[in-house]
Amino acid sequence: MTKKAFLVLEDGSIYPGESFGYEGEAYGEIVFNTSMTGYQEILTDPSYAGQIVVPTYPLLGNYGITSSDIESSQIQVSGFVVRQYCEEPSHTEVTGTINEYLTSQEIVGISEIDTRAVTRKIRSKGVMMGVITVNISPEQALQQLKNKPSYDEQNFVQKVTTNERYQWTESGLGYDHIADNLRILVSDYGLKYNILRILKGKGCDVEVFPSSATSNDLLAQNPDGILLSPGPGDPELLDHLVTTTEDILGKVPVMGICLGNQILAKSLGAKTYKLKFGHRGANHPVKDTASGRIYITAQNHGYSIDPESLPSDVTVTHISMNDYTVEGIRHRSLPALSIQYHSEASPGPKDNEYIFDDFLEMVKETK
């Protein structure tokens, strides 16, 4: 028999539903994602650490869980809120249901929620903390929530980064080998596997380092380039990553994605700020300021670069066509570029993988 469950927001809003996945309590920042597919990639994206994710699409789990759709070693979200989930998925590679997947990793979910009503709340009020509760009352859960640290107070990068450096060997399919034998190091702030697949597929020698690696640790490897990965949390808490990036700028080409974009910007003297409800979905239009071309991008971020704080030697290369926030920057003289959206997609459109080519061409030019 299905147990009752409740989604409780920090403003006191209570949404009754039914438990699925693991039965317990889950605390986190409530965010919504507008993607229609790709739920397994979303669940395993480390950038969602500390967050309870609300997909706006009403039916989740219809193609089940597969071994090929993971973006990290485990589920990363704190909780999952859905309107409805499928108990009998259909897929040639299915290994289980979404309910079984959440249960096996002790991730709390709630179904039968009006997810679009929750989304409207977040759009109008902004992101806020919340809790999914199964075993205690909504009133008790709200009281416990008040004693939990806010999302912005927690360093999630140190929770999701790798503990040890490792070589990546799995190659993505269908890529031109434009970068044979280029040695690329990836600083793991909470990376997705598809970044590594793309780099390897293009011919790179790829090694991943923990976020605690110093500039000396990285430069001692004599890399041809360094990629600053996506990741969760507030960049204001990550001064050590900014310092490390400052130390490597000008010594080796650098590319940043999402959180890596914010870290690069801060290392160049810019400031960041929190968005009201962030950008999370697979259909965000972004304009390339040089060509004027519009790309549809996958996004997952809650912070952005303050364009007024960018120094004069940094140019804005991409902007959001939804709210005109900064979506990419490039230094005018140093070999450094970054983007706010997810060029690796997973899930989402692959139109923007050309950014990896731009980075690798920059690396080859500086060798």
What is each stretch, according to the model?
Residues 1-216, 221, 235, 346, ...:
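RNA-binding accessory domains that recognize and position tRNA/RNA substrates
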Residues 292-334:
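Catalytic beta-strand/loop cores that center a nucleophilic Ser/Cys/Thr
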Residues 114, 258, 301, 342:
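Active-site glycine-centered loops adjacent to acidic/histidine catalytic or metal-binding residues
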Residues 85, 231, 334, 344:
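Flexible loop residues that form catalytic
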